Amino acid sequence: MDRRRFIKGSMAMAAVCGTSGIASLFSQAAFAADSDIADGQTQRFDFSILQSMAHDLAQTAWRGAPRPLPDTLATMTPQAYNSIQYDAEKSLWHNVENRQLDAQFFHMGMGFRRRVRMFSVDPATHLAREIHFRPELFKYNDAGVDTKQLEGQSDLGFAGFRVFKAPELARRDVVSFLGASYFRAVDDTYQYGLSARGLAIDTYTDSKEEFPDFTAFWFDTVKPGATTFTVYALLDSASITGAYKFTIHCEKSQVIMDVENHLYARKDIKQLGIAPMTSMFSCGTNERRMCDTIHPQIHDSDRLSMWRGNGEWICRPLNNPQKLQFNAYTDNNPKGFGLLQLDRDFSHYQDIMGWYNKRPSLWVEPRNKWGKGTIGLMEIPTTGETLDNIVCFWQPEKAVKAGDEFAFQYRLYWSAQPPVHCPLARVMATRTGMGGFPEGWAPGEHYPEKWARRFAVDFVGGDLKAAAPKGIEPVITLSSGEAKQIEILYIEPIDGYRIQFDWYPTSDSTDPVDMRMYLRCQGDAISETWLYQYFPPAPDKRQYVDDRVMS
């Protein structure tokens, strides 16, 4: 496993994979390959042609690393790169009457070394024409770019694209595809957060992780007044190729993406990740180790939520562990899963730079049968908010062999809340802290004699209030240790119930403790299932140190 670090901001999604063999296949498919932007040549395109292109590409050898950039682009700083602006007067759909959407392209440079080709498609005639790079499309401002080095570089390509929505047609984008196969979107706050990817390969194996690239995009010309657009993408990497169709709905309060892909394996793949997403969790109510700042919480997402094929709802709060952790949750035809950011209260973050209270959740809804597999969750130790350390994806049970073909359909919801909710009581928050003392005496006149860790899980909604007179029973399962001092407390401000218990070790082991809890009433489950992974300290650290100076 090669541990990855994802730098946020302009460096967040730098392409790290090799160059594609797309050029020869374009000519085979009779696409315009001429570098002359003024030749006006058009060629037929539709999704079936793209699938054939991806299939044929998989039969050829991957061509490795991208070619070098001109020096003036290769040596750019993030600040210089961010100062380059696309000329809004030359946007993709600038001439569409009553346009509600528009698209601009990202410049090559810095860590963005992979050439991405762009094509405009007339959806009525299915004719496509390539959009070639030229310096006149951009405003270089104070980036310090020597544009003389770019003259005649019509095949330089672009790094990616972003889409804007009225009334912010040139100021605030709502969708962005940039670097490798990364992409992201916003809700009505216009605040970016976590990212998705086209595909993940060998994220947690003994092989180096592979990052496929989107190497070309085809844009259907948007219709007048429309807030939905369609873009097609060709994916390429050493082990696999793919044809993707994104139908993207830029709604008032959310962005919804309908994704269809057709994948063609070049090689055997140890771990194939479908609908992968990448996020950041530094600290939160349950994990305080890295919260020695003025900010009470720092995270893009606070939990993994899963709606299993059997109907069970699971809430798994995220962690920032001291050692890399990978967990796989078995399922059969999952109904949905996602990394959610449900705490939207500014006072819980106190961050006027990151605005974590405004960051969207991302929910995956399979649209065809995915069969058996696992939802994988990787949590990487991180020292702060600039490194993405959370990865989640679906891994099919069937091993991937060279020559295999797959097709997946799913819908992505970028929104403040997921489109579906557990009808039972839901986990609102998880808190941890010192245990071993009666609640209300924290910790009293002296520290507890016996070390313990306290867990408090707040549940809201569902039939909790109706169940209370009949008796609410927490069902707690631990992989090691004991749960004691279990309490059920009504919390009036949230109109919910807190289940509180202390965990006591029964051995010196420092292996992660898997915890599972749900609520039931008269034998029936009345809540979603809470899953947690706790990392106990070494035996010599299981003590309370009174460092008070009394004289």
Swiss-Prot record:
Organism: Escherichia coli O139:H28 (strain E24377A / ETEC)
GO molecular function: carbohydrate binding; catalytic activity
Annotated signal peptide: 1-32
Family of this protein: Belongs to the OpgD/OpgG family.
GO CC term (a single one): outer membrane-bounded periplasmic space
Name of the protein in its database record: Glucans biosynthesis protein D
Modification after translation, per record: Predicted to be exported by the Tat system. The position of the signal peptide cleavage has not been experimentally proven.
Function: Probably involved in the control of the structural glucose backbone of osmoregulated periplasmic glucans (OPGs).
Main localization (coarse): periplasm
